Amino acid sequence: MSNNDNNLPDTIRGAARIRLGHSELAVRPIGLGCMGMSQFYGPADDAQSVATIRTALDLGVDFLDTSDIYGAADVNMGAEIRGFGHNEQLIGEAIAGRRDEVVLATKFSARLTEDGKDIVMDGRPEYVAEACEASLRRLGVETIDLYYCHRIDPKVPVEETVGAMAGLIVQGKVRAIGLSEASVEQLRRAHGVQPLTALQSEYSLWERGVEAEILPTCRELGITFVPFSPLARSSLTGALQGGASFAAGDFRASNPRFASENLATNLVPVETLKAIAESKGCRPGQLALAWLLLQPFDIVPIPGTKRAVYVEENLTATNVALSPDEIAYISSLFAPERIVGQRYAPVHAAHVANAK
């Protein structure tokens, strides 16, 4: 990767890189999640998405997150929308000629059934190899930096899946491996086969279920934690109102926490967050990201956006200072018992070890 920071904006130039697990990979404190460029959050323009990714690189973002499934299914697991691998193809186009500027993370295991109406998990060793080859082609790269098992296949021992992933490292097709949405037990079993570099799961002020066991286990094992939805699907930006409605294809339309009977309650502490942010001269989302970055764990959040302006706004969170008392107060505002509703609808929870 390129280490020339001279042309980067002040918002990120001075940010120290974080080493991912025990690997040789190191990234800046905030990455970019690219899923929304292909599905779940309304229409997306491919040209705009490619431009956003390239602007992110210009701004110093060096950690991009995708998956082969992004673009393949709508929120209700119905018919194909953009196509399996669409998001990887977008990223491949965006990073062409700039590969050395990026730590590239993608995932496998989730695939559509033949009728396109459901998603199944496939952790068979033969599928691990097949999926990796396909991702390499779509991304237009020779090596994937960080390869995750997106969801663990309950039909295949995790040791077999991870063993096949370890084989990809030996073959030079992958530099490091990780899991997504795994339980502590699955994490330990997998780590016993091949040291894991990263675990990805949801974590934000709104969703703190990983704090009790997952995060301490990651710290014990030397695994970097990569939170997705660190802004709680825009809830922590201050942009949503209690009466917000979502289009049928929007992930939030079927998410219990965004149901009308829950959303108003869940947004109450956001009003206080907005006031604190105003007093500190920053945006609520920046404050929420700063809180996350200041947790006592190795964490690299990957907020997603389709618009370049929000990439820059998110990066500025690295400049927000919080005292220990401020961190504790903000934590208390979003105590888990104050957030109502499960974090996944049943159709998605079925594939997640820690879905509550």
Model-identified regions with their sequence ranges:
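Active-site-proximal loop/turn and secondary-structure-junction residues that shape catalytic pockets
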Residues: 36, 68-70, 108-112, 148-153, ...
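Conserved, mostly hydrophobic/aromatic
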Residues: 20, 32, 49, 64, ...
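N-terminal small/glycine-rich loop or linker at the start of catalytic domains
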Residues: 22-41, 105-119, 143, 148
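Glycine/proline-rich, positively charged
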Residues: 111-209, 213, 224
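Short, well-ordered coil/turn segments that N-cap beta-strands
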Residues: 27-30, 60-62, 98-102, 141-145, ...
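Glycine-rich, positively charged active-site loop/lid region within alpha/beta enzyme cores that binds
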Residues: 28, 35, 116-117, 217-276, ...
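N-terminal binding-site loop/beta-alpha segment at the start of enzyme catalytic domains
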Residues: 1-102, 356
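Conserved short secondary-structure transition element at the edge of the structured enzyme core
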Residues: 169, 261-319
